[in-house]
Amino acid sequence: MKSFYHYLMKYRHPKPQDAISQFANQAYEDHGFPKTSSDYHELSSYLELSADYLETMATFDEAWEKYETEVHHA
């Protein structure tokens, strides 16, 4: 199964137009991001405790929903 990070990288963009693209760009620059994880709670905890670049967890939740739909139910 594709990790959340690997999935998120498809949203990277040099000129991000939305919050998920900004999140993807920032996660790419975050060397501590749990790149192999597919666990919601692990990722959520990391972002809440260690990532100061995410303005709202709603962005993560939206990206997670897309990940769940496209990867887990594909």
Curated annotation (Swiss-Prot):
Gene3D superfamilies in UniProt: YozE SAM-like
Cross-referenced InterPro entries: UPF0346 (IPR010673), YozE_SAM-like (IPR023089), YozE_SAM-like_sf (IPR036806)
Family in the record: Belongs to the UPF0346 family.
Name recorded for this polypeptide: UPF0346 protein RBAM_019500
Source species of the chain: Bacillus velezensis (strain DSM 23117 / BGSC 10A6 / LMG 26770 / FZB42)
